[in-house]
Amino acid sequence: MALLNRLASALESHRVRDRLIRTLGYCCQLIGGVLVEQCPNRSEVGRRLLVVSAQFNHCRTVLRLFDDLAMFVYTKQYGLGTKEEDIFIRWLSVLSNVTDQLYYPCEHIAWAADAKVLRVDSAWWWTLNTALWTLSLLLGAVKALWTMLKLRQKLRSPTGTSASQLPRSKRRAMEARICSEVLTLLSNLADLANAVHWLPRGVLWAGRFPPWLVGLMGTISSILSTCQAVRAGRQAEADSP
């Protein structure tokens, strides 16, 4: 019963619910794509799963109509990142925040065009939206890789201190941060593969992924981000008095 209560409580969170919908959507696309391509006698089930996947994706698009304000508050609080020690991370984060802020209205316009609310070319807005997502993922991957390398450098030869002389708690915190950055990097790269696939044909491997491969990349990314969230939650519980 306690587990059921915790699950119910977690699902009240928008982030947890979005993460679950995302994972289910990509899992349905993965399984559905495999059934359609590899199992002719189960192709009808596969097509139904692909429809379910599309509906999950549409659900997330509608829910993101309300994310602009939260993103704006975060961007405003970060500002120009004057508190950031690493100037490279600082400007990567500023550019990433601007990209993410522009992503939402572009998606809203594309959605409204598909819904016949606005008379504009939805394909153009979806392309711009995907390009912004691709840039955001690329910036996130570079940021995670840079942070990971800097932390590893500190562990190996921190200024004026040998690695063995670092306090155990600080060393564990740095190792946990490195693990978190690795998960972020891999998750962003998996999403980046899909983002490029959804760009106009002629751009790298755009349009070449079968549905099951899109589902696989998305499922990997979703599982990695879920693992990262669970680790962060446990770390927060451990740090709380």
Curated annotation (Swiss-Prot):
Side Lumenal, residues: 150-211
Membrane topology: Multi-pass membrane protein
Pfam families hit by this protein: PEX11
GO cellular component, one term: protein-containing complex
GO biological process: peroxisome fission; regulation of peroxisome size
Ranges in the topological domain labelled Cytoplasmic: 1-122, 228-241
TM annotation in the entry: 123-149, 212-227
Swiss-Prot/TrEMBL keywords: Membrane, Peroxisome, Transmembrane, Transmembrane helix
Compartments where located: Peroxisome membrane
Assembly and oligomerization: Homodimer. Heterodimer with either PEX11A or PEX11B. Interacts with FIS1.
Role of this protein: Promotes membrane protrusion and elongation on the peroxisomal surface.
Name under which the protein is recorded: Peroxisomal membrane protein 11C
Source organism: Mus musculus
Name of the gene this protein is made from: Pex11g
